[in-house]
Amino acid sequence: MMSKARISSLMKVISSGSCSCPAHSRSSTGGLNVSSENEYAFEMSSSTIRYGPGVSKELGHDLQNLNAKNVCIVTDRNVAKLNSVKVAFDSLTRCGIQYQVYDETRVEPTDQSLLHAAEYARQNKFDSFVAIGGGSVIDTCKVANLFSADREAEFLDYVNAPIGKAKEVNVKLKPLIAVPTTAGTGSETTGVVIFDYKPLHAKTGISSKYLRPQLGLIDPLHTLSQPEKVAAYCGFDVFCHALESFTAIPYTERGSAPMNPNLRPPYQGSNPISDVWARFALKIIRENFISAVFNQDDLKARSNMHLASTMAGVGFGNAGVHLCHGLSYPISGHVKKFVPDGYSGDHPIIPHGLSVVMTAPAVFKFTAASCPERHLEAAELLGANVSKANRNDAGSILSDVVRQYMYKLKIENGLDSLGFTRDDIQSLVKGTLPQERITKLAPRAQTEEDLASLFENSMTVY
């Protein structure tokens, strides 16, 4: 645990707004790892993806193919009871796979919940890992895998700067298979873990391409169990992943190229390949999102949203996100008493997708002037008629489209409905400043006053 002096020092860094994004930056060495040459390249990488209704029944065979002898299954108690998940467990039994179950995952993980999972993994000699659940489960499994591979590491060693030491992952991790049961985070495709660091009431993370699952089994049958609100909140995470990666600055404008290509950040800026996935996801959202939320038995709509989640994950996992996500971290980190429908009531939480979309109408109205064509195209992909639109109206048009989706899907009316007041704005701004590595991927730069205005304009949405 951190000393009080260390926490005080970090609070000063965070308040200064000069640090790198603690959720996604990889290195603490700053300019030592970059050249004087502007970025000229981008990379595209992802997990192997297998998609199809019922594909969970192949899990046992996949573990056989890995010659797995002692498997750690990370899930949570509610997910483990689902009939669709039992199919996955039955496949393990049928194939003679020996496994142990860790089901104490916390929705919206914290440093303590991740440390608990890591210690569990260290107590056993697992040769492979399987995550069956939503993004919280998959992220928890990534951490368990990492710290079981490096048994001497302290928790903050791999946590991103300035909170942690941002140690590079040099140990060999065990194979990890992700079976996402929600259509939202896309964590099955990324090497990023996000969690609440409670001593600072801040979101931070661990980021390395080596954390990325070896295989993602995308089985849309799991999504039929999602309650309405869970489907809506998770869907808006997909929604914003696609919009933010599509409107991020081009990869050539991100900054200097790294001295070593291995140090190229996971989030590189918009690029031609990520754009393909973003467009694909936005089109699916237009055609399926509303039905997927309100019709729990609409397998086609829920299947398509599950596919959109993965495709948007591939896109943003390489291009990045920007302001909606950067602003979301202090929103969820400063939760007061809000407990949403469809979630366990054992602790207040603001689900990730809800915290992200809360500021989206204000964000895209703010960023549009820097790349109006992109914003208009996004609005059109989501169903707006922009044939006679003026470039100067791009922000208002996309903002209205986002607002209409939120209204139709019965999303809470702004930060006020989550328990925030205007007195909280300065704290929310301070919580956003450390997310610079994300927020500077936005097509328009921001001052503290701009950030305050974005929160102000998000107090109510309708």
From Swiss-Prot:
* Reactions the enzyme catalyzes: (S)-3-hydroxybutanoate + 2-oxoglutarate = (R)-2-hydroxyglutarate + acetoacetate; 4-hydroxybutanoate + 2-oxoglutarate = (R)-2-hydroxyglutarate + succinate semialdehyde
Regarding protein family, the annotation reads: Belongs to the iron-containing alcohol dehydrogenase family. Hydroxyacid-oxoacid transhydrogenase subfamily.
The answer, when asked if Transit peptide is one of the entry's keywords, is yes
What's the stated role of this polypeptide? Catalyzes the cofactor-independent reversible oxidation of gamma-hydroxybutyrate (GHB) to succinic semialdehyde (SSA) coupled to reduction of 2-ketoglutarate (2-KG) to D-2-hydroxyglutarate (D-2-HG). L-3-hydroxybutyrate (L-3-OHB) is also a substrate for HOT when using 2-KG as hydrogen acceptor, resulting in the formation of D-2-HG.
Q: What's the EC number here?
A: 1.1.99.24
Q: Which GO terms describe its biological process?
A: glutamate catabolic process via 2-hydroxyglutarate
Q: Which InterPro entries match?
A: ADH_Fe/GldA, ADH_Fe_C, Alcohol_dehydrogenase_Fe, HOT
- What's the name of the protein? Probable hydroxyacid-oxoacid transhydrogenase, mitochondrial
Query: Where mainly located?
Result: mitochondrion
